Amino acid sequence: MDDIDWLISSERVEYLEAIGIMNERVGSIQKGEARELVWLLEHPPLYSAGTSAKLDDLLMPNRFPVFNTGRGGQYTYHGPGQRIVYIMLDLRRRRQDIRAYVSALENWIINTLAKFNIHGERRSDRIGIWVRRTDIQQPNKEDKIGAIGIRIKRWVTLHGISINIAPNLEHFNGIIPCGIEGYGVTSFEDMGQPIEFYDFDMELRNGFQKFFGARSEMGLKG
């Protein structure tokens, strides 16, 4: 097993509090004073703006608090019913390749979705993980179920991924998610496959080694 910590927060964590904790931990990792960390949590309802966010994509600026953040990407929604995964890995000890890291995140999400019989796919022109809506007999309709937004600071990763378990999907209407128009957002619940956070978290953790373990492309250097 890799030398890495896992933390699951049972209570919702305020956004700025989480960012502060993450930045402090990343600083300690950079100095070799702390182990890598994968942190699973939920936030209260909010919109976060990545470094490429366009103000026109914020359709309802007064609906929820809006936070500017250093991660890549555009606007996204976070809130109850969504599993947030903040990933703090030291790529100096792994593979210093940002594209390979993002690819590993995508594959990790897709692998986890498959454990619940949901077929997630990536798209070269659209960030995130997508599903074809065969559940409503609309195979040509694609909705996003997982989002990715990262930052790399001195080769230590920040931010990470979010997967829609059972959020209020109407809350996404206040933004154009990730600046991508013409596509919807879905969740496990929306697709008729409600699950418990515990079950999702266990499958996510079980799949970590496959994509970030010692024998993976993003594994620790020997």
Which residues does each predicted region cover?
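Short, acidic Gly/Pro/Ser/Thr-rich loop/turn segments
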Residues: 47-48, 155, 170-171
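Active-site donor-binding loop signature of nucleotide-sugar glycosyltransferases
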Residues: 11, 150, 190
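C-terminal accessory segment of soluble enzyme catalytic cores
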Residues: 130, 169-222
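Acidic/histidine-enriched ion/cofactor-binding microenvironments in catalytic or ligand-binding pockets
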Residues: 150, 155-156
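N-terminal lobe of the biotin/lipoate ligase/transferase fold
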Residues: 1-145, 194-198, 222
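Conserved phosphate/anionic-ligand binding catalytic regions in large, soluble enzymes, centered on
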Residues: 156-166
